[in-house]
């Protein structure tokens, strides 16, 4: 007995000590990383102080001494605010502002007369050490998981250091100072571009780095200090391209959730920047040396640039109009926790973004061509504006590209509920006895409420929910289904997915039992679908809560020319009534909707003893399905809806770009592998890409 108690006590003590060591190891690791950041900051402060001291010693400029002493005084105040008054935000803001100012001041002071001085060489090595420590600290923080990525465009540290650097540039002449201030704005745009993971962010980073050390930008006076400022600011957003796990809408949240007026003003502000760049490009016409090349080139590509950027601004304006509509719906359905992703998908934002991505690409191409034609290597203001415009348009292209890739397609749904539980000898539904009417009405109402909840949660446009106790005739159902299957979005194209729900009596072979002895076969429904779908690539998903859905599930697997899925239910025939209630129509709908609308559900479709099991089948080409891509006619309709006639000639260029199909060999191989997977290893849970899943037990 004593041995057992001693063993239990020693075992518990060992576990406690092991856990304590793990906690201490984590704390020590976190502290080490934090101290590494402090070391990088202190090293940078020493480098700045030594650099300013060398310049004061060699030039005897009293302004340097005044700023040096003032800088130390401000940093002392920041330390007092931090340690004695616990004003961390004010202290860090003040210190970051002065770090940016002092580093900028160090950049723009001439050191040509004492480049080989020992103290100046020490300053350079200290700055290089600061770069290495800063990169190492950021990398270790992210690899250890100590960084919490939050949606932001610019952090407070980045903004204040950029402002401080811009203020330091005012010590130069007005023209040179303006050039540097614009360069700082361009650097801020590049940081945002990297943090948003734009498709063209890395090429923009390369272009910025190549152009950064032009003499007209006043960087060569102290390129090491300039490189230190640039790399320290770029490190975090550059590493976050890999380490950040934020989704598209999370990254763009500061912009997408901005107020309506602010987003509209951003379009106006973008237009002013673009116009300024065009005016600065026109200064190239003063160059009479190559007038025979410059004048024709600027005239042709300038007109092309103007047309493309009119389209660009109208595209941004149209995007914000659709986004405002999405915010209205989001505000209305706030209690239902509808995410902006689903709302944008339901409003056809994916189709809009796919077309807009191509149009913005033309704007980027036009800017690159105009910049090359009107290149002015000695004009720092032109170069800075060029570096502002590129990431600005790159961000717009990246936003449309990512939203077009991640958003689900549009969908529309139609539900039919025929509450009949008893059948005549010939298999036709009959009216229920009065004592069962109330129970059946409650169950049918529950099915209607569940499917309406499903449509609302997944932002599926509702065509209708028909409830009929006497059944539907074949002609009535024919007219309703044809009207449902030919529905289109507001922008013109067909919906990506059509969801048809049916709960009612079926025959043993799966046909729907209709009023008057009529039936609806799957072949008949497919014929109507082919007639309405035509050459489009929409999907039809049929959800059956009936006693005989298995025949349709098996039959749909033989279809080869359409994208169709059938989600059905299997009800256990033999069951011990003492252990569980017999399955009824509506039980599957309740569980399936709860599974797809509640992320914290505990429904397990494969558990033993389930009275209602799930089964689904898909057509042979189901895995080939991709969301509807804009066709030539879609682009033409989009053009007529949003843009003036003067821009119509570009529609042919847009259609040509839509028709490009690069990497077709890789896509073909990947398609074959997915077909094999769906035919041989049908997954237990199949994501439809619309937010809900098909399941099988």
From Swiss-Prot:
Glycosylation sites: 111, 337, 533, 598
Topology of this chain in the membrane: Multi-pass membrane protein
Listed transmembrane segments: 36-56, 63-83, 89-109, 151-171, 172-192, 199-219, 223-243, 265-285, 293-313, 352-372, 380-400, 646-666
Keywords per UniProt: Glycoprotein, Membrane, Nucleus, Transmembrane, Transmembrane helix
Compartments where found: Nucleus membrane
One GO-annotated biological process of the protein: regulation of ubiquitin-dependent protein catabolic process
One Gene Ontology CC term in the entry: transport vesicle
Record carries keyword Zinc: no
Coiled coil: none
GO molecular function annotations of the record: sodium channel regulator activity
Role of this protein: Plays a key role in maintaining the cardiac electrical stability by modulating cell surface expression of SCN5A. May play a role i the modulation of anxiety behavior.
Similarity remark: Belongs to the TMEM168 family.
Name this polypeptide is given: Transmembrane protein 168
Organism for this UniProt entry: Bos taurus (Bovine)
Gene behind the chain: TMEM168
